[in-house]
Design a protein with these regions (language model features):
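Active-site beta-loop-alpha junctions enriched in small/polar residues
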Residues: 121-123, 159-161, 183, 229-231, ...
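Short, acidic, Ser/Thr-enriched surface-loop or helix-capping motifs
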Residues: 352-353
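Cysteine-centered iron-sulfur cluster-binding motifs in ferredoxin-type domains/subunits
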Residues: 50-57, 346, 398-400, 404-405
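Glycine-enriched alpha-helix->loop->beta-strand junction motifs that scaffold or abut catalytic
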Residues: 172-178
Length: 482
C-alpha cells in the first residue's frame, strides 16, 4: 500500500534529531509568517459571556475558587457591549467569507457557520440579552454575502437549573444546540455541583432535562449534548455509566445527541484527573479485537455502526487525523498554526468577556486579553502572546521531546495569571505514552490494507463535515478557487 509506506517513512523522518532544530518560529517568523496569515482564517466560533452571575457554586469551578481574574459577580454584559461584539464579529467573518468562491460557500457555511455561543456564569440568568443578541446578529445585512438566517447556528452552555416555557420555546424553535452540565447520577453530581447553600443540584437539573425530553424529544435527539466533568473526587466510571444508561447514549434509542467528558481543570495542572497508568498490552489487544470486528462488517454496516458508536468513531477519526500531523505529503500543506503548536489566536475562536475584552477562548483564565470590542484585536498583543508562549516552548523541555508535534498542548490550557506554565515531568510522560500508543494503533490499522480502505469509504458515507466534527482552523485560501 503506497500510502502506508509513505506515512511510515514520514514517521521515521519526523523522529530524526534534525527535525528538532526548530520546533517553533523565531521572532521574525512570528511577524512574517504567523501574523501575516491572521486574516486567512474565518472564525469557527463566536462566544459572548453574557453574565458572571451563576446559580451554582461548583466546587471545582475556577470562578468559585477565585483563581486568576475569573470570579462570580452580579455583572452582566450590557446591550452596547453586545452590539459592539456582534459588529466586530460580523466584520471579521464577512471580510473572510467574501473571499470564498461560490462553489465552496456551502461547505464553508457547514464547517464554520455564523452564529453565537452564549457563555456565563449561567447564561439564562441574562436571558434577555441572549434574545437581543440573536435578534441583532440576524438584523445585519448577511444576505449581501449570500448568507441566510437558515445558515446560522447557535449554542449555549448551561447548568440547566433555570427553565421556563419561554426559554424552552426559544431553544426548540431556534434549534439551539444545548450543552447541559451533568456529572453523573445524584451521588456523583451533587459532590461538586451545588447551590450557594451547599445543596446539590441534581434533582432540579435532571427534572428539567426530563421536562425538555417530554416536550420535544426530537429536538433533544438532534441538539442536546450532556457534558460531564471528571472531577478528582468522584468515581468517573460510575458517573459516566449512569448518564449513558439514563439517556440511552450510544444506542438507537438515545434521548440526546451526544455525551462529552472533560477532566477537571486545576491551576498549574495540564492533565488533572487523567489516568497516570496505561496498560499498553491490554489496550493493543483490545484494539486488535476491535479491528477484527470492524473488518468483518461491510461498508454500509460500518456507516450505521459509527452513527451509534460515536466513541469508537471518535477513536478512528483521531487515528486518521494522524495523517495530517505526520504531514506525509509536504510541510507546506500543513496549517502553519497547527505545525507550530497552537491555533490562530484571536480569529479561530473569538471570545468576548462580559466587560467586552477579547480573549483567546473560554478555556483561558482571562489573564491575557488580546483586545476589546471597541478597538478590535491588537496584533501587537497577539505578537506578545505568541512570543511569550514560544519562548517557554523553545527554552523548555519541549525542544528535545520526540512527541512535540503530536502533543495536544494548548496555550490557553497552559496560561495562568498571564504566564505560560509547561506540564510537569509526570504529565509529559503520560502524554508521550498516549502518543506512542496512538502511533502503534495507527500502524496496526495501516497494516490492515483492506480494513483501512473500508474505513475510508465508511467515513465518506457518514454525514458531511460540520462545525460539530471539523477540528481544524479553516484557512480560506483553500476555498478561494473552484
Amino acid at each position: 500500500m503506497k500510502k502506508k509506506n509513505i506515512i511510515i517513512g514520514r514517521i521515521k523522518q519526523d523522529f530524526k534529531p534534525s527535525v528538532f532544530q526548530q520546533i517553533v518560529p523565531n521572532e521574525n517568523e512570528i511577524e512574517n509568517l504567523v501574523l501575516n496569515k491572521f486574516e486567512e482564517y474565518i472564525p469557527r466560533k463566536f462566544t459572548i459571556e453574557v453574565t458572571e452571575k451563576c446559580t451554582l457554586r461548583c466546587k471545582y469551578c475556577l470562578f468559585s475558587n477565585q483563581l486568576s481574574e475569573r470570579h462570580h459577580s452580579e455583572i452582566e454584559m450590557d446591550d452596547l457591549t453586545m452590539k459592539k461584539a456582534v459588529d466586530y464579529y460580523y466584520l471579521i467573518y464577512t471580510n473572510a467569507f467574501k473571499r470564498v468562491s461560490n462553489g465552496y460557500r456551502g461547505e464553508v457555511l457547514s464547517i464554520a457557520p455564523p452564529g453565537i455561543s452564549w457563555w456565563g456564569g449561567e447564561p439564562f440568568t441574562n436571558f434577555e440579552l441572549i434574545k437581543k443578541s440573536k435578534a441583532y446578529i440576524e438584523s445585519l445585512p448577511w444576505h449581501e454575502y449570500g448568507i441566510e438566517k437558515d445558515n446560522f447556528v447557535y449554542s449555549v452552555v448551561s447548568n440547566f437549573t433555570i427553565v421556563n416555557d419561554e426559554i424552552l420555546d426559544f431553544l426548540i424553535s431556534g434549534k439551539i444546540y444545548l450543552f447541559i452540565s451533568l456529572d453523573g447520577g445524584e451521588k456523583e453530581h451533587d459532590k461538586n455541583r451545588v447551590f450557594a447553600n451547599n445543596k446539590g443540584s441534581f434533582s432540579r437539573v435532571s427534572h428539567n432535562i426530563d421536562i425538555l425530553i417530554k416536550k420535544a424529544p426530537e429536538y433533544c435527539r438532534k441538539y442536546v449534548v450532556i457534558q460531564a466533568v471528571l472531577a478528582n473526587n468522584i468515581r468517573g466510571n460510575q458517573g459516566v455509566n449512569s448518564i449513558i444508561k439514563t439517556y440511552g447514549i450510544y444506542t438507537l434509542d438515545s434521548k440526546v445527541l451526544n455525551f462529552q467528558l472533560y477532566p477537571q481543570k486545576v491551576k498549574n495542572q495540564y492533565l488533572p484527573g487523567k489516568r497516570k497508568r496505561i496498560n499498553e498490552k491490554k489496550e493493543l489487544a483490545d484494539f486488535d479485537l476491535l479491528l477484527n470486528q470492524l473488518n468483518s462488517m461491510p461498508v454500509q454496516n460500518l456507516v450505521q455502526f459509527f452513527k451509534i458508536q460515536k466513541g469508537i468513531l471518535n477513536e478512528i477519526e483521531n487515528l486518521f487525523a494522524l495523517d495530517s500531523k505526520i504531514a506525509y505529503e509536504n510541510s507546506q500543506s500543513c496549517c502553519i498554526y497547527k505545525k507550530w503548536l497552537t491555533c490562530p489566536a484571536g480569529v479561530d475562536n473569538i471570545f468576548v468577556s462580559v466587560s467586552g475584552d477579547i480573549h483567546i477562548c473560554n478555556k483561558s483564565d482571562y489573564s491575557f486579553k488580546l483586545g476589546d470590542v471597541s478597538t478590535g484585536i491588537s496584533l501587537n498583543r497577539i505578537k506578545r502572546f505568541y512570543s511569550q508562549y514560544y519562548h517557554v516552548i523553545r527554552n523548555g523541555k519541549c525542544h528535545s521531546c520526540w512527541a512535540v508535534h503530536f502533543c495536544g498542548i494548548c496555550p490557553a490550557a497552559l496560561l495562568n495569571d498571564g504566564k505560560f506554565h509547561l506540564p510537569n515531568k509526570d504529565e509529559c510522560e503520560v502524554v508521550r505514552k498516549n502518543i506512542c500508543l496512538q502511533l502503534k494503533k495507527y500502524i496496526m490499522l495501516l497494516n490492515k490494507d483492506e480494513l483501512y480502505e473500508k474505513l475510508e469509504s465508511a467515513m465518506l458515507n457518514l454525514p458531511k463535515r460540520t462545525f460539530l466534527n471539523y477540528r481544524e482552523p479553516l484557512n480560506i485560501r483553500l476555498y478561494e478557487k473552484d
